[in-house]
Amino acid sequence: MAGHPRRSGVPPVNEIRPAADGKAVSGMGSERAWCVLAPNPSPMTLDGTNTWVIAEPGASSVLVVDPGPDDEEHLRRVVDVASAGDRRVTQIVLTHGHLDHSAGAARFAELTGAPVGALDPAFRLGNEGFAAGAVLDAGGCELRVVATPGHTADSLSLLLAADGALLTGDTVLGRGTTVIASDGSLGDYLRTLDELRSLADEAGLRVLLPGHGPLLSDPAGVLDYYIAHRKERLDQVRAALAAGARTPAEVVEIVYADVDRSLWPAAEQSVRAQLDYLAPGS
């Protein structure tokens, strides 16, 4: 965000914001959060995975969110940013287990000696378990774990109340909307969006720090859009079914006709989630 001074000891980086072409860049997301953009751009990961380095000004402890892909150069860049000013990484947190967020976690733990925490025990290293509502502390910088299932069953967000910021992983993206994965649930996702919309008011959120894409400076407006978009898509799916579509692929051809065909497989996954949600008795 504009206007935040750079702290001493931190390598110079640009602010994370939409570039001229609407893409994210590495740098400061809020006073206590920096992004290191991973070199894994794709239609699904947008500009790449945002690895977040969280630290209280002047503190010696750092928390890192989503080390990202198992890319040695990227992981060492994160180490450089995190260890500036004689700081050390004391915790690693995964917003969910997808490989673009978690594949580098084991190697990053080797480089830093820090444990890896996640809601799903399968992704933990060093027995770092926690539940929704837990408060994580890194040198006085507190983040509250918010369970945000939907994109995946194990998705979480992190409330950085001191900055009015929410780290959203893939629950809310910096550009476009997210896909409901095979282990996710649209019903859970809709409830999550409603809960985050309430949190935006209750916590006075000023910025969303996503797992992909640039930061979002209007949390309430973004969440209102996400909720409206999901409801509109459900209405479109209902209309496609009424018009005779019977399979997810047929629904995609109607509902996502304006979407690049390279994204249709992902759209088909979302349609499956929508059909499950609309099924009688669901």
Where does each model-flagged region fall?
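Conserved beta-strand hairpin/beta-sheet module of binuclear metal-dependent hydrolase folds
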Residues: 22-82, 142, 157-169, 174
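Actinobacteria-biased recognition of intrinsically disordered, low-complexity terminal regions
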Residues: 1-16, 21-25
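Metallo-beta-lactamase
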Residues: 59-64, 69-71, 142-239
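Histidine-centered divalent metal-coordination motifs
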Residues: 95-101, 151, 212, 274
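C-terminal regulatory/interaction regions
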Residues: 7, 239-282
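Short hydrophobic/aromatic-enriched beta-strand-loop microsegments
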Residues: 113-120, 167-169, 261-263
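Active-site HxH/HxHxD metal-binding segment of metal-dependent hydrolases
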Residues: 42-48, 67-144
